[in-house]
Amino acid sequence: MPELPEVETTKQGIKPHLEGCMITSVQVRNQKLRLPVPLNLNELCEGKHITAITRRGKYILLHMDKGYLLIHLGMSGHLRIVSQTANPQKHDHVDLHINNGLALRFRDPRRFGLFIYIDENPYQHPLLAHLGPEPLSDDFNSEYLLRKAANKSQSIKSFIMDSQIVVGIGNIYAAESLFLAKIHPNTSAKKITTEEFNSLTGHIKKILESAIEAGGTTLRDFYSSDGKPGYFRFALKVYGRKNLPCLVCENKIETVVIAGRHSAFCPHCQPIIT
């Protein structure tokens, strides 16, 4: 699933082509996504100008002079800027035609994504209203995490992947951040010290910033708006490296299942706290 860096990379890629432009038409080829694409989306959007493009967690928001489009890439989705004459492929579900001859094309083979219209304040929509702070904001810091972790017996990895605690951190960047902070992923959140939270928040911010600069991480499905893969996969220290030697101590990378997800870690660099 695309995480914050991949969504931010996508937002940055489409922004120069869409902001300030007018939507001339919308073509919906398949409305059956996680939530149905509105059948009258063309009527809702035609003739409106895109005034801004922002990101909230893993969601992309297209602000129009009236209303908003809320987009989520799901497990396998991506957005491309294409010519309006470009032939659609099998999983190209929605085209947003712009008055500059280009189109925003939404592709989603597994159809877990979203492409919906919101009339009112989008930040009060149920999908956004309860999200935690952005990890690259000043609101996300060790004091905040320490306060939220009080009496939380869940694993620290599940804790930082909870979008109500902090948005945008999925399996890849949680594993990498915990490795750099030398924290075992199964450690109870309430046992993490202030010093460890200082280290963890710092590494989360640095990793996300580095991943954005690298265009995200492409392991299978993710491609940016210009069709290029993300290159942060070459910087991964533990994710996807089970049984390979740790790049720090040369012990074998192991995995443990936490909340149904395989979590990579180094047993030497990240000892469990009992």
Curated annotation (Swiss-Prot):
Binds 1 zinc ion per subunit. Coiled coil: none annotated. SUPFAM superfamilies: Glucocorticoid receptor-like (DNA-binding domain), N-terminal domain of MutM-like DNA repair proteins, S13-like H2TH domain. It catalyses: Hydrolysis of DNA containing ring-opened 7-methylguanine residues, releasing 2,6-diamino-4-hydroxy-5-(N-methyl)formamidopyrimidine; 2'-deoxyribonucleotide-(2'-deoxyribose 5'-phosphate)-2'-deoxyribonucleotide-DNA = a 3'-end 2'-deoxyribonucleotide-(2,3-dehydro-2,3-deoxyribose 5'-phosphate)-DNA + a 5'-end 5'-phospho-2'-deoxyribonucleoside-DNA + H(+). InterPro entries: DNA_glyclase/AP_lyase_DNA-bd, Formamido-pyr_DNA_Glyclase, FPG_cat, MutM-like_N-ter, Ribosomal_uS13-like_H2TH, Znf_DNA_glyclase/AP_lyase, Znf_FPG/IleRS. A zinc finger (FPG-type) spans 237-271. CDD domains: EcFpg-like_N. The active site is at P2 (schiff-base intermediate with dna), E3 (proton donor), K58 (proton donor), R261 (proton donor). Pfam families: Fapy_DNA_glyco, H2TH, zf-FPG_IleRS. GO terms for biological process: base-excision repair. Involved in base excision repair of DNA damaged by oxidation or by mutagenic agents. Acts as a DNA glycosylase that recognizes and removes damaged bases. Has a preference for oxidized purines, such as 7,8-dihydro-8-oxoguanine (8-oxoG). Has AP (apurinic/apyrimidinic) lyase activity and introduces nicks in the DNA strand. Cleaves the DNA backbone by beta-delta elimination to generate a single-strand break at the site of the removed base with both 3'- and 5'-phosphates. Monomer. NCBIfam families: fpg (TIGR00577), PRK01103.1 (NF002211). Belongs to the FPG family. This is Formamidopyrimidine-DNA glycosylase. It comes from Legionella pneumophila (strain Lens).
